[in-house]
């Protein structure tokens, strides 16, 4: 398979104007300490989180689409939205907001900085109604004796969180994105967490709903739910690197009612539909994976997590129903697995329990549940799910995942978009991760633009192409701050011009997108050069 990758070289030429080039610019502003009044972060600057940055009520932090925010490594830079404060991170498909490592391309690693924490006033199942977020930040979450399940902590939309997640001690970690007691008035959609040093996403109680989530090459669990979380989740993807797993065991889903498995109310009962969880094993004979990989879903400690219309494949064990409380929830039908596919499970039948007298495999295969199980991941018929730099988890023609979904269950409320397919992606519609997700953040050079000297700031951006690497075509987008004659050319590594994609007069203030077909090129690295001459 040929693989073509772009590195973006931005050259901006305005006749009769003096320019400062800010490609790969250093940090423009350091954010630290407490934020007690409203702040606005502009995409014309790069920001650095230093230490634990607390946004306190009634402040709102608003982040412009396209903004790049680094987390400082030595100080464990972390953004914390405390109860009563808000974050408005409303990116776009063309201009996602990116929280990432400050380290150079090629030298980034899980745990390079802390992560993003949002604390709300919704219900949790801890006595007294409040608790402290793990990870050493001291953040309090939950609404106490007067919780508000409709609490609004703001918006995360088209946001990437890359190389976060610090494990201070076992069970005391900052995850990529922590949502503690967050209410359903909050908007969470189109969020990718990549290379998290601990869990990618973790919900500590609360009622917040979310759609379009990606966990990419995380270290520990992909989606962790506990302390009475009762939100609805739809359309999620997890892709695992076979070499990266946590010493304590890595799972796709991990869920607890609380830390000791009490029956405290409300019980942890997230309703999950249309997730695709891709484990480390491309087939059951594959042995070159980290031995700390465990289960596609580990339901334990009295949780009642329920999964519908989803795919879990490529794990040593597919599903573990752990403990008597989980067993009785399963047999009592408060814990449900319905209309889902499990495949490519290495050990035994892949569906298991530690409870004598309970046959988890028979329970899973109850005909009315509509579940299916396949020996090999390939039988699910996804196009290229184990491609680690450009995964394609879309069902191919005649895939069994193209049909079999059901939304007749009363738990699948109007929040859920009804589909006929199971898993995260439609076989017939455009992928929802296109244009904003990044499956190679290790090699991405973040560019904020070029600034004209003087008091007026003008921005000129060439965005990272998607997909990258690509075969045979990719999309290239750019933003202009001035009207002018604009050219976009492609060069090889020797500097020879390969192709002119654009040579036209264009207007400022628009995002332009071009498609580059590289089917006639050999594998290698190519450069996109964008120039403009002011008219």
What are these regions (language model features)?
Residues 23-62, 72-84, 91-92, 96-198, ...:
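Extracellular beta-rich repeat passengers
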Residues 1-25, 448-450, 458-461, 477-479:
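Bacterial Sec-dependent N-terminal signal peptides
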Residues 16, 136-138, 152, 309, ...:
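Intrinsically disordered/low-complexity terminal segments and short unstructured peptides
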Residues 453-535:
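C-terminal outer-membrane/trafficking sorting elements
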Residues 5, 19-20, 415, 428, ...:
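Serine/proline-rich low-complexity intrinsically disordered segments, especially terminal tails, linkers
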Residues 3-6, 14, 33, 252-257, ...:
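Intrinsic disorder/low-complexity segments enriched in polar/small residues
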Residues 68-70:
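Primarily the HKD phosphodiesterase
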């Amino acid at each position: 398979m040929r693989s073509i990758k772009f590195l973006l070289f931005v050259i901006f030429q305005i006749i009769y104007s003096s320019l400062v080039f800010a490609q790969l610019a250093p940090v423009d502003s350091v954010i630290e300490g407490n934020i007690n009044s409203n702040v606005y972060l502009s995409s014309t600057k790069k920001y650095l989180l230093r230490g634990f940055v607390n946004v306190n009520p009634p402040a709102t932090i608003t982040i412009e689409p396209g903004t790049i925010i680094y987390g400082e490594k030595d100080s464990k830079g972390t953004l914390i939205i405390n109860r009563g404060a808000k974050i408005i991170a409303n990116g776009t498909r063309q201009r996602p907001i990116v929280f990432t490592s400050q380290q150079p391309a090629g030298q980034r690693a899980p745990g390079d900085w802390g992560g993003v924490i949002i604390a709300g006033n919704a219900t949790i199942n801890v006595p007294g109604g409040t608790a402290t977020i793990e990870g050493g930040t001291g953040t309090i979450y939950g609404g106490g004796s007067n919780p508000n399940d409709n609490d609004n902590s703001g918006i995360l939309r088209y946001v990437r969180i890359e190389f976060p997640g610090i494990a201070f001690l076992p069970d005391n970690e900052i995850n990529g994105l922590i949502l503690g007691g967050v209410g359903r008035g909050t908007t969470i959609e189109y969020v990718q967490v990549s290379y998290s040093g601990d869990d990618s996403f973790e919900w500590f109680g609360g009622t917040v709903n979310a759609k379009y989530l990606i966990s990419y090459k995380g270290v520990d669990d992909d989606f962790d739910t506990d302390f009475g979380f009762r939100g609805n989740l739809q359309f999620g993807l997890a892709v695992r690197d076979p070499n990266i797993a946590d010493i304590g065991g890595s799972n796709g889903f991990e869920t607890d009612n609380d830390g000791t498995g009490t029956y405290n109310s409300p019980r942890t009962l997230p309703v999950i539909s249309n997730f695709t969880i891709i484990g480390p094993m491309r087939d059951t004979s594959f042995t070159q994976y980290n031995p700390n990989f465990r289960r596609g879903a580990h339901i334990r400690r009295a949780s009642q997590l329920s999964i519908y219309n989803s795919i879990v494949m490529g794990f040593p064990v597919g599903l573990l129903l752990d403990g008597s409380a989980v067993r009785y929830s399963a047999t009592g039908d408060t814990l449900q697995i319905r209309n889902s596919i499990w495949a490519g499970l290495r050990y035994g039948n892949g569906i298991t329990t530690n409870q004598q007298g309970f046959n988890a495999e028979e329970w899973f295969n109850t005909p009315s549940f509509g579940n299916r199980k396949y020996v090999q991941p390939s039988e699910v018929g996804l196009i290229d799910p184990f491609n680690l730099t450009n995964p394609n988890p879309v069902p191919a023609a005649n895939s069994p995942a193209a049909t079999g979904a059901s939304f007749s269950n009363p738990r699948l409320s109007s929040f859920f978009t009804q589909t006929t397919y199971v898993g995260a992606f439609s076989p017939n519609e455009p992928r929802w991760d296109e244009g904003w997700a990044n499956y190679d953040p290790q090699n991405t050079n973040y560019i904020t633009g070029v600034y004209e000297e003087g008091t007026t700031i003008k921005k000129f951006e060439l965005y990272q192409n998607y997909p990258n690497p690509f075969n045979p075509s990719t999309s290239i987008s750019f933003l202009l701050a001035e009207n002018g004659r604009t050219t976009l050319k492609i060069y090889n590594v020797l500097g020879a011009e390969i192709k002119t994609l654009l040579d036209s007069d264009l207007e400022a203030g628009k995002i332009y997108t071009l498609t580059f077909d590289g089917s006639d090129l050999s594998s290698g690295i190519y450069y996109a050069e964008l120039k403009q001459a002011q008219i």
